[in-house]
């Protein structure tokens, strides 16, 4: 079961933001979308998930146009954690997490799924707190926990699943960044196709099996970290002097200042 994009382009507010995208998203793999600001990363994620309509080309889930799949059915096939999370009402954390549980799940199972999601994301201590009293980083953690609840509820439907995370590590400390990315890798090991938008190239190199480097609305490089995280690849895409070095068994990126 794959998500396929063929000749895909997209526009937002009359501006062309994606063009000529051809790729497949595979199950059992973590794919990171990286690139400079305005490269089209979040738009590409939205197109893949079926939330943003492509201006041209085709986006298909196992051969079926993804936008033709009814929203309720689409929710059982993929989970999306969006970049922004605003909540003006004083819902408790457990209420927000339960909103991620699919309607098709029997009522008696919902509490078990919520409790499991809270445990898996180390958020049990927050379950009875109003979200309006949480910091931005804590709200980001709640948003991820809600996504986990949706994933766990979709297990009851025996459906192919994809997870889309838009900047999930923003506003988080290093410990919770690691937790989210480790969970993403665990979901891939369970057979999910995972797509993550990341600004931090070091996190992308550590967590991803595959990296798509975007620039100017196009995928300019597509491959494993060892082929994408290279000075000669990153420097022109980001228009910045970078150094890439090996340490602790992985690749790391640093910007050279003063050049």
Description of each model-found segment:
Residues 157-158, 163-167:
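Catalytic Walker B motif of ABC-type/P-loop ATPase nucleotide-binding domains
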Residues 3, 18-20:
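Conserved structural motif at the start of ABC-family nucleotide-binding domains
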Residues 34-36:
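The feature captures the beta-strand-to-loop junction immediately N-terminal to the Walker
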Residues 230-231, 235-259:
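ABC ATPase nucleotide-binding domains
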Residues 49:
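Helix-to-loop junction immediately C-terminal to a conserved catalytic motif
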Residues 58-73:
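ABC ATPase NBD Q-loop/coupling interface
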Residues 111-126:
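Conserved ABC ATPase "signature" region
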